[in-house]
Amino acid sequence: MKKPNMMLLVFSAMSFVLAMTAFVFSGILDKVAVSLDISVAQSGLLNTMYSYGAAFGVPITLILFRKVERSKMLKLMLFATILTTFALIYAQNFVQLLIVRLLMGISANSYGVLAISTILALSPKDRQGRSLAFYIMGSSLALVIGIPLTRALSAVLDWRSIFWILNAMMLLSLVYFLKYLPKADHEATKLDLKNELQFFKDGKTLLLLAYTLTMFMGYHAFYTYATPYLLLLFPSIEPLMSLILVGLGLASFTGNLIGGHVSDAIGYAKSMMLGAVLQTAAMLLILVFQPSKWLSVLFIIVWLMSAWFTGLQLNTGIAQVTDNKSSFMLSINGSLIQLGGAFGASLAAVVINLSGIQSIVFVTLLTSLALILIQVVSMRKYP
């Protein structure tokens, strides 16, 4: 991929669509609750079940289908996501919705892992960072425009209609992949459990996985509560909150884009160190300037940009350490992202109950310092 071609554009569009299927309920939980006659807290379980499917179901799925050629498996998982979306639209009660969301978390995130490994396989090594950044750009755009747009559309469309639109886009992408996606080298990409387990004995890989878990614990500890954090400290900011959320979305988009170029220029390991330092510095500034409304907003934007700058390095690192021969390790990395998020948000909830929402800064600051330590050890031991 010497330049973003049609294949990469379709992958990026699918990244947008699948991010929307994951996040869409977050923007309209209140409306979903009304339509299903349940509480907002209960409707939040639709996201929780999706995360559990992603965390635990993806590695198991890749093991069960390890003999299927990668591009065929990718199409199967996309087709399964289309079917689960139809099931979601026609579900008759809340329990059915929860089951379908669990299955959707498995199929959509299995597709995501296979998409990443396919993109990296199709890209020269010196452009893998930029290709991956272009792919992830789809999910960051979902945060910038997709979720706010969904909220606006919910005034005239119910949530099922929104999923009809997303499913139509998935169907078009599947048709394109069926016609144009090249087959992968089956011998190079099939899952060999004995060889896969060897990666768990590799210190460099384990440190990468530890970095992933730690980073997303800190990320979700703060980001999950970023909106109530700002509103509680600065109630006067509420009329501008939608604009601030757009700013946060743009920060994620920009950080991801810069991260791809920097990764190709200096390598993923140095980029991970740079990202950890930037996250730590941003958190320190958020803490120091906590009484200042606009400086708090500014440094939260800087922190989010540095987090998204770092995020794509993790998949690039796993791919390069395993010579892009392990979709299974990419799925483990994805599972740790989901688990880290769940642990971080839960830890933040405990901290908020014990000492107030302003204290969540300390959770993310500590995890950022831990990232620096992990990466120092990794770069010294495995130069």
Question: What are the functions of these language-model segments?
Answer:
Residues 37, 69, 90-96, 289-290:
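Helix-breaking motifs and short loop linkers at transmembrane-helix boundaries and internal kinks
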Residues 57-69, 255-267, 352:
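Helix-to-loop junctions at the C-terminal end of transmembrane segments
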Residues 84, 95-103, 294-302:
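Paired small-residue
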Residues 96, 125-127, 133-179, 225, ...:
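Helix-loop-helix hairpin linking two adjacent transmembrane segments in secondary transporters
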Residues 269-314:
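C-terminal transmembrane helical hairpin of 12-TM major facilitator-type secondary transporters
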Residues 320-356, 364:
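A late C-terminal transmembrane helix in Major Facilitator Superfamily
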